[in-house]
Amino acid sequence: MPASTPVLFVIDGDPGAAHALRDDLSRRFGREFRIVCESAADAGLAALRELAVRRVPVALLVVGQDLNGMSGVAFLGHAHKMHPQAVRTTSCCID
């Protein structure tokens, strides 16, 4: 995929949930988008910073509610500053 391929970004404090969503998105949208998955807030913000520096568009941010030290809403606030054009949503898992 070209470096400018838009990104669907997934982050969840539960690595299993993050990877399951990543796999689902990859099956459905993997030909048109690059799927990036993280499970920690600091790693997620670092990945988003790198994408911003490289001017890679982020089309969608799917963010879990609890990122082990940061809320999903707080993460979205930081992410919005780097990628204001991205569609932003939160996710939750119900057992």
Protein language model features and the residues they cover:
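Non-catalytic signal-transmission and effector/linker regions of two-component phosphorelay proteins
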Residues: 1-34, 49-57, 81
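Cofactor-binding loop segments of dinucleotide-utilizing enzymes, especially the Rossmann-like FAD-
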Residues: 13, 40, 93
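Short acidic, S/G/P-rich loop/turn micro-motifs used as interaction or catalytic elements
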Residues: 14-16, 66-70, 95
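Conserved Asp/Asn-Gly motif in the active-site loop of CheY-like receiver
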Residues: 35-42
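Short amphipathic alpha-helix used as the core "switch/output" element in two-component signaling
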Residues: 46-49, 66, 72-87
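Active-site residues of response regulator receiver
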Residues: 59-65
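Hydrophobic/aromatic residues positioned on beta-strands within the core alpha/beta folds
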Residues: 63, 88-93
